[in-house]
Swiss-Prot record:
This is Small ribosomal subunit protein uS11c. It comes from Adiantum capillus-veneris (Maidenhair fern). Disulfide bonds: none annotated. GO terms for biological process: translation. Coiled coil: none annotated. One of its GO terms (cellular component) is ribonucleoprotein complex.
Amino acid sequence: MSNKSRKIRSRGGKRGVQKGVIHIQASFNNTIITVTDVRGQVIIWSSAGACGFKGTRKSTPFAAQAAAENAIKASVDRGMKQAEVMMSGPGPGRDTALRAIRRSGIILSFIRDVTPMPYNGCRPPRKRRV
């Protein structure tokens, strides 16, 4: 086989993906959106801090919406048509991020809440006295 007929794909190139998994991690301080393929390889990620929000503004629902729109726009540019959504965390931006994903036009096969809930595991930290 000659060198011209072989296709060489670079490692860091853009991967076209039809179906993916959108992970929404919503903490009280930030919202992180990670888009992976079905095997778990990260395609694109975005967060409220990466979108330019600093300090307490990172924890707002508007910042979560901006992060979700940023990640979805980049994944649609790479050819994503269908996705599954995995949400975790109790943060204020989880519903707003999901609303932004729904508006984007990507077909959602299912939405799953994967927030870890202890069956009375570790002792929680003491209550704050402000």
